[in-house]
C-alpha cells in the first residue's frame, strides 16, 4: 500500500512557508489538501458576510494555486470529528498534517482528531507556522506561566533561539511525483461554495475592499515594503484623513487568515532594514505588530475564558450595565455622534477600520460613555472585522476597556474632538454618512449645535433625519471615570492614581492585571495595516482634549482626580506632545503629575 497523505487547512491558507504541508508531501505517493466547512455553522455563527466572503476568496485562491501544481483543494462539508474517520477509510490515509493551533478551542479540537487518527493508524504531523515562536517554550521559559507584561514578554523573546527561516514555497519541484487523485465531479463534490449556497443574501453587496487570498497578500506585502517614505526611516506615516481609509498595503486580514506568513513578513522586514541601514541590527520595535500578536496569543493559549469576564483570572470584574437598545445604536451607527457612527458604518460596509478608530468606538461603548461590557463590543467586532482573531480581539477589548493589560482609565476619547483633530474637513464623515454631507466642517462633528437654518440648508434636521446624541458625553464620561476610580481603589494590588496604574508583578512578570511597568510601550501596530492590536505606534501623535464639550480640536479628555474629590473635574488639555501617549510610551511620573495632578480648578460641566 502506498503512502496517502492529507493536509488539513484551517488558518494558514497559503503555499508559502507551510512546513506541515511540505513535510507531509515528502515521501508521500498521494496528497489531498482539505478544508472542512460546516454549512450549519455558516448560518448560525456570529460571523458576518464580509468575513465569509473573504474566507471563500481565500479558498478560491488556494484552489487556483493548487491547480497550477496539478492538484486541487477539497472543501468538505461537515464536522471534523465526523469527516476524518470516513476519509481515513475512503482514501486509505496513512499521514495527516496540520498547522499548530495555539488557541484553547483549537487545541481541544486537534487533540480529538489526533486520537481518531491514532486509532486509525494514521501518522499526525503538527508544525508551528501561524506564530513566530513556540508559545509553550515562552511559557516554559517563564516558569510555566504566560508573561503578563509586554516588557517581560520581550525579555523572554530575546532569550529564545533565532527564528527558523520560512519553509520553501510548495512548487511542482517540491511536490515531485506526489500526485492528487481527482474525479470528474470534483467541483460538484468538493468545490468552494458560494455565499448564496451558505444562505447569505448578496443583493446590494458591494464589491470587496479587501480581496481575500495568498496571491493578494503577497502583492500587498511587496507594495508595503516598497513604500518609499516608510522604507527611508522605518517610521509610521503621520495620521491624517486618508489614514482612516482602507490601504492597498494593509496586511492585517491576511495575517489573520494565514494568507501571509508572519515569519515571511518578519524576515522581509529584517532584510529590508539591513539593506537600508547597512547591516545594522534591527530594533524589536520594527516588529511591533507581530510581537504584540505573539504576546496576546501567549496570554490566551492556556486560558479558555480569555474572551469572558467571569472566570477569567486576568480580567477585572467590572459591573457593566446591560442596555440592549444602547448597544444596538452603537453597533448600527445610530449614536448621534457622527465620528462614532461613521466608524461603525465603515466597519459594517468594509470589514475594517483604522486602529485609532477602534480605540474611539471601544472607549465610547465601554468606559467612556455607555458603560456596556467589552464582551458585547468584542462580539460585534468578531462578526464584522475581517482581521478579528479570538486571542487578539478579546485581548484588545480587555485592554481598551481598562479590564486588563493597561489601566489608563482617566484618559477618555472625545467622540467629537478626536475625529475633528484627525480630519478637520469632515471628509470621512461625508463619505460614510451622506445624510450629513451638506453640513459645513464647523458643525459636521457636532451637528446638533448647528443653527436650524444651517440644518435646513444641509437638508438634515437633527432629531429627524439624523439622531440627536444618545448621551451627554461630558457628564457620562465624568461619571464613568469616577466608577473606574472606585473599582480600582478596591483592587488589592492597586497603588493609587498618581501614577499610571502600574500593577506590581512578581519576578517572572505575572502581575494579576497585566499592568505595564513605567516607561513601557503600550501595544502598537506596525504600518502593516493596523490589525486587531489596536495600539499606538512609537512616535505617533495622539490628539488631546480641551474642555468639557470637546468641540474645538480635541481628542482625549484628561481628568483630574484629587483624593478628596468625589466628582472629577475636567482639566484643560494640552497639545498631544504633552502626554506620554504621544510617543506610545507611558508618561514619566513628572509628565503624569502634570497631566492628572490634583491641583486643578473646578470647571462647570455646562
Swiss-Prot record:
Binding positions for FAD per the UniProt entry: 252, 289, 355, 387-389
Motif LIR 12 in this chain: 486-491
Substitution effect: residue 588 to A: No effect on circadian period length and protein stability
Resulting phenotype, residue 497 to A: Loss of interaction with MAP1LC3B and significant decrease in its autophagy-mediated degradation
Consequence of substituting residue 280 to D: Phosphomimetic mutant that leads to destabilization of the protein and abolishes ability to bind PER2
Motif window: LIR 9: 395-400
Keyword terms: Biological rhythms, Chromophore, Cytoplasm, FAD, Flavoprotein, Isopeptide bond, Nucleotide-binding, Nucleus, Phosphoprotein, Photoreceptor protein, Receptor, Repressor, Sensory transduction, Transcription, Transcription regulation, Ubl conjugation
UniProt note: phenotype after gene disruption: Mice show an advanced phase shift (around 4 hours) in the expression of DBP, NR1D1 and PER1 genes in the liver. Double knockouts of CRY1 and CRY2 show slightly decrease body weight and lose the cycling rhythmicity of feeding behavior, energy expenditure and glucocorticoids expression. Glucose homeostasis is severely disrupted and animals exhibit elevated blood glucose in response to acute feeding after an overnight fast as well as severely impaired glucose clearance in a glucose tolerance test.
Consequence of changing residue 276 to A: Reduced interaction with MAP1LC3B and significant decrease in its autophagy-mediated degradation
Protein name: Cryptochrome-1
Amino acid at each position: 500500500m502506498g503512502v496517502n497523505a492529507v493536509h488539513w487547512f484551517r488558518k494558514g491558507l497559503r503555499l508559502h512557508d507551510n512546513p506541515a504541508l511540505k513535510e507531509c508531501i515528502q515521501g508521500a505517493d498521494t496528497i489531498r489538501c482539505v478544508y472542512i466547512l460546516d454549512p450549519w455553522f455558516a448560518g448560525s455563527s456570529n460571523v458576518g458576510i464580509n468575513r465569509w466572503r473573504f474566507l471563500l476568496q481565500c479558498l478560491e485562491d488556494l484552489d487556483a494555486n493548487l491547480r497550477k501544481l496539478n492538484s486541487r483543494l477539497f472543501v468538505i462539508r461537515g464536522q471534523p470529528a465526523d469527516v476524518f474517520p470516513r476519509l481515513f477509510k475512503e482514501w486509505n490515509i496513512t499521514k495527516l498534517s496540520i498547522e499548530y493551533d495555539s488557541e484553547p478551542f483549537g487545541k481541544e479540537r486537534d487533540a480529538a482528531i489526533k486520537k481518531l487518527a491514532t486509532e486509525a493508524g494514521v501518522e499526525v504531523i503538527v508544525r508551528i507556522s501561524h506564530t513566530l515562536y513556540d508559545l509553550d517554550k515562552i511559557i516554559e521559559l517563564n516558569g510555566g506561566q504566560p508573561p503578563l507584561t509586554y516588557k517581560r514578554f520581550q525579555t523572554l523573546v530575546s532569550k529564545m533561539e533565532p527564528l527558523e527561516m520560512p519553509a520553501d514555497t510548495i512548487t511542482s519541484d517540491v511536490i515531485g511525483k506526489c500526485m492528487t487523485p481527482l474525479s470528474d465531479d470534483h467541483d460538484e463534490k468538493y468545490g468552494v461554495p458560494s455565499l448564496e449556497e451558505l444562505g447569505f443574501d448578496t443583493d446590494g453587496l458591494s464589491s470587496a475592499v479587501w480581496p481575500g487570498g495568498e496571491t493578494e497578500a503577497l502583492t500587498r506585502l511587496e507594495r508595503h515594503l516598497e513604500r518609499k517614505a516608510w522604507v527611508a526611516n522605518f517610521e509610521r506615516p503621520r495620521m491624517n484623513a486618508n489614514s482612516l481609509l482602507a490601504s492597498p498595503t494593509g496586511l492585517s486580514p491576511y495575517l489573520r487568515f494565514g494568507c501571509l506568513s508572519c515569519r515571511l513578513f518578519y524576515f522581509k522586514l529584517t532584510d529590508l532594514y539591513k539593506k537600508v541601514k547597512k547591516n545594522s541590527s534591527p530594533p524589536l520595535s520594527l516588529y511591533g505588530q507581530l510581537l504584540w500578536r505573539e504576546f496576546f496569543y501567549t496570554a490566551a493559549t492556556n486560558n479558555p475564558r480569555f474572551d469572558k469576564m467571569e472566570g477569567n483570572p486576568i480580567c477585572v470584574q467590572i459591573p457593566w450595565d446591560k442596555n440592549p437598545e444602547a448597544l444596538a445604536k452603537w453597533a448600527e451607527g445610530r449614536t448621534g455622534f457622527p465620528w462614532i457612527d461613521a466608524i461603525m458604518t465603515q466597519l459594517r460596509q468594509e470589514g475594517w477600520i483604522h486602529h485609532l478608530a477602534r480605540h474611539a468606538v471601544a472607549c465610547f461603548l465601554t468606559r467612556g460613555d455607555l458603560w456596556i461590557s467589552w464582551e458585547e463590543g468584542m462580539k460585534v467586532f468578531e462578526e464584522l472585522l475581517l482581521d478579528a482573531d479570538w486571542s487578539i480581539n478579546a485581548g484588545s477589548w480587555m485592554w481598551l476597556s481598562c479590564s486588563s493589560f493597561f489601566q489608563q482609565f482617566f484618559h477618555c476619547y472625545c467622540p467629537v474632538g478626536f475625529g475633528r483633530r484627525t480630519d478637520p474637513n469632515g471628509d470621512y464623515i461625508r463619505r460614510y454618512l451622506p445624510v450629513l454631507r451638506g453640513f459645513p466642517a464647523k458643525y459636521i462633528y457636532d451637528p446638533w449645535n448647528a443653527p436650524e437654518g444651517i440644518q435646513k440648508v444641509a437638508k438634515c434636521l437633527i432629531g429627524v433625519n439624523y439622531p440627536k446624541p444618545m448621551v451627554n458625553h461630558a457628564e457620562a464620561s465624568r461619571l464613568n471615570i469616577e466608577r473606574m476610580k472606585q473599582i480600582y481603589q478596591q483592587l488589592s494590588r492597586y497603588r493609587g492614581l498618581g501614577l499610571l496604574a502600574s500593577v506590581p508583578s512578581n519576578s517572572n512578570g505575572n502581575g494579576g492585571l497585566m499592568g505595564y511597568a513605567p516607561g513601557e510601550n503600550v501595544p502598537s501596530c506596525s504600518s502593516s495595516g493596523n490589525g486587531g492590536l489596536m495600539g499606538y505606534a512609537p512616535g505617533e501623535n495622539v490628539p488631546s482634549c480641551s474642555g468639557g464639550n470637546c468641540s474645538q480640536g480635541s481628542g482625549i479628555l484628561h481628568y483630574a482626580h484629587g483624593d478628596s474629590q468625589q466628582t472629577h473635574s475636567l482639566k484643560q488639555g494640552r497639545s498631544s506632545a504633552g502626554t506620554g501617549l504621544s510617543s506610545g510610551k507611558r508618561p514619566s511620573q513628572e509628565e503624569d503629575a502634570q497631566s492628572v495632578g490634583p491641583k486643578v480648578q473646578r470647571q462647570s460641566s455646562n
